[in-house]
Amino acid sequence: MLKIKRDDEIIVIAGKDKGKRGSVQQVLDNGRLIVAGVNMVKKHVKANPNRGTQGGIVEQEASLNASNVAIWNPKTQKADRVGFRFEDGKKVRFFKSNGEAL
């Protein structure tokens, strides 16, 4: 189970986009994430007149490995680690630095 979920604010800690922050748009099954505005690639799209799509070069987000990102803690303004604990019989994620629930 990944500790990062959709709509979490993250920061990239390794790779060409190190230091960039963004929101998780999608979590893929293979341990990869798609983050808004991070790891942008140019994709060549072929025109399809049947669908009415125009061809050209489109810039879009590519996936990142989850090990290259850390969750962003807004209180401390730093990257943080996530832990799990049970509160009232429910599994809750929390920041390891200050113990605050996500």
UniProtKB/Swiss-Prot annotation:
One of its GO terms (molecular function) is structural constituent of ribosome. Gene3D superfamilies: 2.30.30.30. Keywords: Ribonucleoprotein, Ribosomal protein, RNA-binding, rRNA-binding. GO terms for cellular component: ribonucleoprotein complex; ribosome. PROSITE patterns: RIBOSOMAL_L24 (PS01108). Part of the 50S ribosomal subunit. NCBIfam families: rplX_bact. Belongs to the universal ribosomal protein uL24 family. PANTHER family: MITOCHONDRIAL RIBOSOMAL PROTEIN L24 (PTHR12903). One of two assembly initiator proteins, it binds directly to the 5'-end of the 23S rRNA, where it nucleates assembly of the 50S subunit. One of the proteins that surrounds the polypeptide exit tunnel on the outside of the subunit. This is Large ribosomal subunit protein uL24. It comes from Alcanivorax borkumensis (strain ATCC 700651 / DSM 11573 / NCIMB 13689 / SK2).
